[in-house]
Amino acid sequence: MPSQKIISALAEIESSASPQNKLQLYNDLLSETVSASPEPQLADDLIYYLDSVLSEDLSIVAARPILDSFIYTLRKLSSETQIKVAQHAVNLLQSRSASVEEQDAQIREILADAYEAEEEYIAAARALQGIHIDSSQRLVSDSAKVKLWIRIVRLYLEEDDTTSAEAFLNRIKNLPSKIEDHELKLHFRLSQARIQDARRRFLDASQEYFAVSLAAGVDESDRLQALAAAIRCAVLAPAGPQRSRTLATLYKDDRATSVEEFGILEKMFLDRLLTPEEVSAFAQRLAPHQLAQTADGTTVLDKAVVEHNLVAASKLYENIKTDALGAILGLQASGDLTAGEKAEAYAARMVEQGRLSGSIDQIDGIIYFESNTTATGRHIRQWDAGVQGLSEGVERVATNIAEGHLVR
């Protein structure tokens, strides 16, 4: 409830016959209210003050400079007071926003800052969503739109709301102009990686994280975090030629040995069998969404490890009984399926999808692998990875020069 003092002061200003005097009187009262009202009372007094400024008795032309002074003052207040007052302000401005779009945008930005300070990220994002960007009254450049939408995306991602985040990321993709600002481009790629990661598009996410880890102007510790995220996503991706290429790119990066994920990366790249202990240690570094169960009751990690170990087994054996393969893969019988039948199902799906070369004799329960790569060929693959790394490095240098970036 507003104080009696501000009620009386505003009544006196509203009854003043001279519009020229009102601007100064409103500004003087605002300064006096902020300096004299105690914190718990201040929000109520400012809300009552706003009601007077935005009443029908005062034209919007006269109200605009008063609003500008009010916004300047609002920036200096506590986040709690800002939320109460700014939320009331944007509600009042909805009916008159066409005439005060710039002031409405500034108040919404203050409101978003306050919500973010209180870790209310969804509320902050929604406050920013209300900013008018396609209007004849207020011209907004594509660069400013990108900056606004990137912030909204990041706020939604703070609460793992990937659906809302992706909707605004798609708006950026649909802009006719490219993102020129390096920092905005970096935030875009990182946001895209996080969304793809959450949607379990792990190969795409790995590539985006890796690109961020190579970007100029990023702190070294953040680069390594992005590289570690790229490795985790590559490990979780379905086994196959595309993942093998991604693993090779990550493995030949000189920085890979600096992150904890290097051990599992090396074993996967060299097609070595993973032990349950190694998988358990790796699982502790995964995010909750990366450990969520799928429809069949397994996790993405469980499936990725089984498929990897199946590929690793194909490098060790020319053929193997399905029951023996089930034991190697650590599969357990459940329901009507034996461990061998589960192993056969995994192998059949991978062969059908072209991610494993081989054939299955269902009558004898034997899987025949077709592979020209044996365990002794690992050094050749390491050599190939080195050559590939050199080629990609040269290409990256050429790209950086073409884009005008410093070569790091």
Swiss-Prot record:
Its main location: cytoplasm. Disulfide bonds: none annotated. Residues 194-374 form the PCI domain. SUPFAM superfamilies: Winged helix' DNA-binding domain. The keyword Thylakoid does not apply. Pfam families: PCI (PF01399), PSMD12-CSN4_N (PF22241). It is found in: Cytoplasm; Nucleus. InterPro entries: PCI_dom, PSMD12-CSN4-like_N, PSMD12/CSN4, WH-like_DNA-bd_sf, WH_DNA-bd_sf. The keyword Cytoplasm applies. One of its GO terms (cellular component) is cytoplasm. Keywords: Cytoplasm, Nucleus, Signalosome. PROSITE patterns: PCI. Component of the COP9 signalosome (CSN) complex that acts as an regulator of the ubiquitin (Ubl) conjugation pathway by mediating the deneddylation of the cullin subunit of SCF-type E3 ubiquitin-protein ligase complexes. The CSN complex seems to link protein degradation to sexual development. Required for fruit body formation. Belongs to the CSN4 family. Component of the COP9 signalosome (CSN) complex. This is COP9 signalosome complex subunit 4.
